[in-house]
Design a protein with these regions (language model features):
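Short helix-coil boundary/hinge micro-motifs
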Residues: 1-163, 170, 208-224
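Basic DNA-binding region of bZIP-type proteins
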Residues: 188-209
Length: 224
């Protein structure tokens, strides 16, 4: 069946286009709390609800609309987590200036392969740009979330992707500072905590240095 302009809006105006902030929010749905990893996606319904609320998928439709017909919920959740883990690994790699893991790259490439296909379509005025979907709705949603990070790499801005230097945080963020030296996802929280920790360490070290040293034991006479 030929596509028509009324059925497919131009991709650049598509209301499900994601931003880099959306991608990072997706990556940060797994985080450290009190030293333990906490996954906001405990079930597929959790993941699907997040995708719908974020606008990756049509609002007004429940998680069932995102559930692939050929897999169960556990497999669908595993797919979401696998793409998220792969994108996080890529973010960590570029943040630390190291090559990304080959398996992670393969996972991301599988995700973006499901991106909608851009097409020329008939319109009342002659022709316009439309799109058609390649994968199932979940594939398409994950492709949309992967796309902004891939775009930053292609645009040569991957060196601004950071992982928070706070070992109890590790959020992924984009460094928009003028000098490109930002280390914390948020200076008011992680940055200040790090400064406070360094201050406590200096005070402790200073107090240790000022402790009186025990007197050396008196020399005892040795027998002839």
């Amino acid at each position: 069946m030929p596509l028509t302009n009324t059925e497919h809006r131009p991709s650049r105006d598509h209301h499900h286009e994601m931003s880099l902030d959306d991608t990072f929010d997706f990556l940060n749905t797994i985080e450290l709390e009190s030293g333990s990893l906490v996954d906001r996606f405990e079930s597929f319904d959790d993941a699907a609800t997040w995708l719908i609320e974020r606008g990756v998928f049509h609002s007004g439709r429940g998680p069932a609309a995102l559930r692939p017909s050929d897999v169960d919920d556990d497999a669908a959740l595993a797919r979401v987590r696998a793409v998220r883990a792969a994108l996080r690994d890529v973010a960590h790699a570029v943040s630390h200036g190291r090559p990304a893991d080959a398996d992670s790259l393969a996972e991301v490439n599988r995700a973006i392969a499901a991106r909608e296909r851009i097409e020329l379509v008939r319109s009342p005025d002659g022709v316009s740009v439309g799109h058609s979907h390649v994968g199932d709705p979940l594939d398409d949603a994950l492709a949309r979330l992967a796309d902004p990070l891939v775009h930053e790499v292609g645009a040569g801005r991957a060196d601004r992707i950071r992982v928070c230097a706070n070992d109890t945080c590790r959020w992924v963020f984009f460094d928009e500072s003028r000098g490109g030296q930002r280390r914390w996802c948020d200076m008011a929280s992680c940055g200040n905590r790090a400064k406070a920790a360094r201050h406590r360490a200096r005070v402790k070290a200073s107090a240790t240095d000022k402790k009186p040293r025990p007197a050396a034991p008196a020399a005892t006479a040795q027998p002839n």
